[in-house]
């Protein structure tokens, strides 16, 4: 679905699976990933399942790939030249766990690092929710306006973004929060 959406908007998409069947396949996958990063303007990390979808299972796997010396160097160069990175589902979770979000570079996780945690319902949630755009300080938000409300699908078990009050204030003040959940009357809500 994501590849089709990018293609619909005129992007040339290269799907790059990471093969782990043996050590040789992993080495080839790293090299192919690096070659694609070097020749890309956008990197998109999709979601997926691994390890019986244990808590952040695929995200931990993706982070290990991102921390590979060659991949990390390629991503650092990619960021320096202004490349765009986005992730959904476990791909987003991996960006948070690696520090690429919200810091824009690799950061070691600490006890106060932002993270994704179990929903308040403590179970998988799949439904439509409403969000309001509160900031358009990103190329990803071209064509939307502050105040726009969008109905979007969510499907997650670990969809709660947890951050300290100080970090929240920093993200807000830096213009890094671009939407908030709202109820059907457009009022801010913690119900995701």
Which positions does each model-derived feature cover?
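N-terminal beta1-alpha1 cap of cysteine-dependent amidohydrolase-like domains
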Residues: 1-88, 92-105, 111, 117-125, ...
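C-terminal and late-domain segments of enzyme folds
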Residues: 4-7, 128, 133-192
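Intrinsic disorder/low-complexity segments enriched in polar/small residues
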Residues: 108-109, 131
């Amino acid at each position: 679905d994501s590849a089709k959406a990018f293609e619909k908007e005129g992007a040339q998409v290269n799907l790059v699976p990471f093969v782990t069947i043996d050590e040789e396949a992993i080495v080839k996958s790293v090299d192919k990933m690096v070659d694609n990063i070097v020749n890309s303007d956008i990197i998109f990390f999709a979601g997926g399942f691994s390890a019986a979808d244990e808590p952040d299972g695929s995200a931990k796997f993706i982070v290990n790939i991102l921390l590979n010396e060659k991949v990390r160097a390629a991503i650092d160069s990619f960021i320096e030249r202004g490349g765009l990175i986005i992730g959904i589902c476990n791909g987003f979770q991996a960006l948070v766990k690696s520090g690429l979000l919200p810091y824009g570079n690799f950061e070691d996780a600490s006890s106060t690092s932002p993270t994704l945690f179990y929903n308040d319902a403590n179970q998988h949630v799949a439904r439509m929710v409403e969000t309001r755009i509160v900031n358009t300080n990103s190329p990803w938000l071209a064509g939307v306006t502050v105040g726009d409300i969008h109905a979007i699908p969510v499907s997650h078990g670990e969809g709660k973004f947890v951050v300290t009050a100080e970090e929240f204030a920093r993200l807000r003040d830096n213009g890094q929060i671009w939407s908030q959940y709202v109820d059907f009357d457009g009022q801010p809500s913690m119900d995701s």
